[in-house]
């Protein structure tokens, strides 16, 4: 029954969680998050220096409460895991140094976790997790990717955004509309009352050099520009902005694009299971549409529980537990952090020779 303490500090959420695994059963013994959303909202986005400072302040208390709520002491743990890449370097260092220090102090294995692998692992906290092979739609503030996971756990990216991630587009459009930060929850809140068919917005596509389009890739920068033009035109006409209709139209087109390309990829690649994870996976319109269209096309859809869509430490612990189950022993205590590191190289985070 391995028990792992997970730490997450890759961006603006400080988190600590303790999870235990018995066979295929995962139990969240404790799970705490200290959000910085309100502090960063006044700046319209995450300020890295502030984020790092708040992690330093919050993480020790989160670790203390995670162990206390789980009814454990550090000696009871089998391993300690922390996110080390990708993310804000200063923020990542707080979690990594904390995790490595605790591991050294209590003589426990340290597992360095890739942030995107942790998001992929979040679906295993659902009641009915998938069985490989499956396709993952990772959709968040920093990433929009389609990733195939095979029976051996190997990952291959089949599609990606060439500019803004979907979550980034939500933030930018919300700012254009004066809705504040973070954009996803703000847009969802008012879109409920809006007419999603009022404004025609583009489904951005990515052209191939030889002609045609990449079928599984995404582009959201043009969509953001289209919303801006509608806003400017309405202001020139001295009309009150129909915020609910704009929000609903934008939210619907993003959901349509994500669902259409994800399921097309499944069908053309012969995959009958789709996993959706990441912060944008919390969007209710997207969740409902993905389930409905997936069912109509014979694709089983698995979505991370709402509580574990945005950045959290439970998903870090799950990723670590899955690595332990696969035979991984530990990561080097000399391993640093990296702002960028491809998901395909996540396995390099384990072993005696650190990649950075």
UniProtKB/Swiss-Prot annotation:
Keywords linked to the UniProt accession: Acyltransferase, Cytoplasm, Iron, Metal-binding, Transferase, tRNA processing
Catalysed reaction equations from the record: L-threonylcarbamoyladenylate + adenosine(37) in tRNA = N(6)-L-threonylcarbamoyladenosine(37) in tRNA + AMP + H(+)
PROSITE patterns named in the record: GLYCOPROTEASE (PS01016)
Top-level EC class as recorded in UniProt: transferase
Entries under CDD domains matching the protein: ASKHA_NBD_TsaD_bac (cd24133)
CC cofactor: Fe(2+)
Record: residues binding substrate: 138-142, 171, 184, 283
Listed GO MF terms: iron ion binding; N(6)-L-threonylcarbamoyladenine synthase activity
Annotated Fe cation binding sites: 115, 119, 311
Compartments where found: Cytoplasm
Biological role stated in the UniProt entry: Required for the formation of a threonylcarbamoyl group on adenosine at position 37 (t(6)A37) in tRNAs that read codons beginning with adenine. Is involved in the transfer of the threonylcarbamoyl moiety of threonylcarbamoyl-AMP (TC-AMP) to the N6 group of A37, together with TsaE and TsaB. TsaD likely plays a direct catalytic role in this reaction.
Protein name: tRNA N6-adenosine threonylcarbamoyltransferase
Lineage: Bacteria, Bacillati, Cyanobacteriota, Cyanophyceae, Synechococcales
Annotated gene: tsaD
């Amino acid at each position: 029954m391995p028990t792992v303490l997970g730490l997450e500090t890759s961006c603006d959420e400080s988190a600590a969680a303790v999870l235990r695994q018995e066979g295929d059963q995962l139990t969240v013994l404790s799970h705490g998050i200290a959000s910085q959303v309100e502090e960063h909202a006044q700046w319209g986005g995450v300020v890295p220096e502030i984020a790092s400072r708040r992690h330093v302040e919050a993480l020790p208390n989160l670790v203390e409460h995670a162990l206390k709520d789980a009814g454990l002491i550090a000696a009871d743990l089998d391993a300690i895991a922390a996110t080390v890449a990708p993310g804000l370097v200063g923020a990542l260092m707080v979690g990594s140094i904390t995790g490595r220090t605790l591991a050294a102090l209590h003589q426990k294995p340290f597992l360095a976790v890739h942030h995107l692998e942790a998001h992929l692992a979040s679906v295993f906290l659902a009641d009915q997790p998938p069985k490989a092979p499956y396709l993952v739609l990772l959709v968040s503030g920093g990433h929009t990717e389609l990733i195939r996971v095979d029976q051996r756990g190997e990952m291959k990216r089949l599609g990606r955004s060439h500019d803004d991630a979907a979550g980034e587009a939500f933030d930018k459009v919300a700012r254009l509309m004066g809705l504040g930060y973070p954009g996803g929850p703000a847009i969802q809140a008012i879109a409920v009352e809006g007419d999603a068919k009022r404004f025609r917005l583009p489904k951005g596509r990515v052209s191939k050099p030889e002609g045609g389009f990449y079928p599984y890739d995404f582009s959201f920068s043009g969509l953001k520009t289209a919303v801006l033009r509608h806003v400017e035109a309405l202001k020139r006409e001295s009309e009150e902005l129909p915020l609910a209709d704009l929000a609903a139209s934008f939210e619907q087109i993003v959901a349509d694009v994500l669902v259409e390309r994800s399921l097309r990829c499944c069908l053309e690649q012969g995959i009958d299971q789709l996993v959706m994870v990441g912060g944008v996976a919390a969007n209710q319109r997207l969740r409902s549409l993905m389930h409905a269209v997936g069912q109509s096309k014979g694709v089983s859809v698995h979505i991370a529980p709402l509580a574990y869509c945005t950045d959290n430490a439970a998903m870090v612990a799950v990723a670590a537990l899955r690595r332990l189950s696969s035979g991984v022993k530990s990561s080097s205590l000399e391993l640093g952090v990296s702002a960028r590191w491809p998901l395909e190289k996540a396995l390099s985070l384990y072993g005696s020779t650190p990649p950075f």
